Amino acid sequence: MRLLQVEKGGGFFQALLIRFISMVSGMRLPDAARIVMYHQDFYGKPMTGWTQAAMRGESNWSVGERELFAALTAKWNSCTFCVKAHTAIASLALDKTLVDAAVEDFRQAKLSSKVKAILVFLEIFAKTPDELTAEHVLTVLHEGMTQQEVEDAMAVVTLFSITVRLADALNFAIPDDGDFSRSAPRMLEKGYVFGKSKLLGHPDHRALAEALRKRVLEGPGTMDIALRQAMAKRAAGGPAVGEAAYDDLARQIGLAAYKITDEQVKKVMQKTGNEKAAFELIVAAAVGAGLYRWEKGLSMLKEAHELS
């Protein structure tokens, strides 16, 4: 990873825990787990809380379908780590041949008309949110979906629009296919939190999204709140950030995180003076890009409701 503190653990206990989990599991603890263990109160806790609720909580979309949504979000963002991870999990919950075909080209795969319809919508939501309209929402509603089903699917893609940007900005190490296969059963069964998780009723995605936004963009941190908010807005296509190194990285996180270079992250670390500060700015940009899509989707849901 580009931030060694995140890779090794933010303190003695975290470093020890990472080594212990790696030893017990027989494989290197994936970077997706390391990132939510680091600076937990800032990012890990609100992010894993919403992710667990969206991916394993109550929904008319099956767990396998939600994992497929995550895999395709990763594909639409060219994130190799997340494509492999979520394809492996989805393949345990659904037919592997079907999952592989859907990841290759969901329009040609033998998916239900309902799943294909939501994927057409989600692709626009993920890749070109400014092109999303109420008509797109009405189209999927006419396929028999409820507004709640649309919101549930949007929550998955919002979360993984954040995760894929962090995976590529921080340059997650990519395990071999065997390690992805070994970790997939645990992920399918337990989900996105360590230990036990109680999920009661349908997730309140709007409240969970707001909790994430407030913590990352308004809560205490090493970096100034105004700068974190500026990074978030820039990643969502907003105005330039005053410092060139910050602006360059935030813009790239928003547009195509897989193109980020070591040098871009290094410049931000040099400017901030420490890895935790750089981590906060990278997270702020990724969260800004994801929540921009979420808010756009909610706006179109509201407009579609008023039109229907």
Protein language model regions, located:
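Hydrophobic alpha-helical segments
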Residues: 1-308
